[in-house]
């Protein structure tokens, strides 16, 4: 079994090899394998890489917004439930007070 440090040292070389060049720089320069335009590199490859990055940025932003809305709905629902439970709790405590008052009145007779 490989230790963490051995795996990390082996991965360092792999990361260094794949991180040369930028997105869209072309095959063999760190930006290829994204389609024929990106494989060619140059301005079109970089432009296509930028479009892909923008697409995924917008997609992630939309997903986060949807998640935020869903969580806000959950918060609103639980606040509503809390208010309902508080009303029921108050009603029960009032009824207990009334019963205790009746018990005291019966005890005095």
From Swiss-Prot:
Keywords recorded for this protein, A-Z: Coiled coil, Mitochondrion, Transit peptide
Highest taxon of the lineage: Eukaryota
Main location: mitochondrion
KW Coiled coil (keyword) present: yes
Skewed-composition ranges (Gly residues): 21-35
UniProt-annotated stretches for the region Disordered: 17-39, 73-95
InterPro entries xrefs: ATPase_inhibitor_mt
Name of one Pfam family that matches: IATP
Similarity remark: Belongs to the ATPase inhibitor family.
Physiological role: Thought to be a regulatory component of the ATP-synthesizing complex in the mitochondria.
Protein name: ATPase inhibitor mai-2, mitochondrial
Gene that this polypeptide is encoded by: mai-2
């Amino acid at each position: 079994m490989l230790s963490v440090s051995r795996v990390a040292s082996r991965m360092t070389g792999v990361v260094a090899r794949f991180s040369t060049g930028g997105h869209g720089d072309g095959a063999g320069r760190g930006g290829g394998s994204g389609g024929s335009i990106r494989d060619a590199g140059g301005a079109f490859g970089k432009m296509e890489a930028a479009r892909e990055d923008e697409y995924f940025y917008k997609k992630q932003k939309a997903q986060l917004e949807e998640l935020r809305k869903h969580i806000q709905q959950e918060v609103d629902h639980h606040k509503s439930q809390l208010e309902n439970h508080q009303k029921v709790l108050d009603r029960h405590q009032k009824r207990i007070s009334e019963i205790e008052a009746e018990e005291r009145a019966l005890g005095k007779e």
